[in-house]
Amino acid sequence: PPLDLLELQNVAATENLNEEDHLATAESLVRTLSEFGVNVSMGEVHTGPVITRFDVYPAAGVRVEKILNLDKNIALGLKATSVRILAPVPGKGCVGIEVPNRKPSEVRIRDIIESADWTDSNAVIPIALGKEVSGKPLVTDLTKMPHLLIAGATGSGKTVCINYIIASLLYNASPEEVRFIMVDPK
């Protein structure tokens, strides 16, 4: 099918946080941690459609467990509904603190299908699953998943995920190549 059938990303929605907002949040984060005796230096900032991850490098002698136990205090200091702490960030010597964006942006499948990640994919059956925390399109190979379980709370995006998988199949193969029966018991 032509890509015109899919909606374009709203440009205003992609600008959910500007650099000044990031700097202000980063300063609040460092200040909040220092109030609890945790000295850190700010690292990279990864902006995704729904959350922004702030990488912080703890000073020598700071225990990671101490940062993990401050999640509610960090959320309070940043005026966020909640924060998630990834300690340590795999492959890096830092702690990631994920903060919800004030205005989450929608992830459109057209953005993923038009991306280099999709067009350059070596997957036998590529599926567009969304975007990573960093905002990078997430494309994976359905053939590498012998079993697939989609679960989550109400409103978490299970149906959207299934729709993305079906649309990925339709945009990757011709009608002669794709044959499936879908049953929705609802």
Which residues does each predicted region cover?
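The Walker A (P-loop) glycine that initiates the GxxxxGKT/S ATP-binding motif of P-loop NTPases
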Residues: 87, 152, 185
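Conserved glycine(s) of the Walker
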Residues: 157
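Post-Walker A helix-loop "phosphate-sensing" segment adjacent to the P-loop in P-loop NTPases
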Residues: 168-178
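N-terminal "pre-motor" subdomain/linker immediately upstream of P-loop NTPase catalytic cores
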Residues: 1-149, 161
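Switch/coupling segment of Walker-type NTPase motor domains
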Residues: 176-186
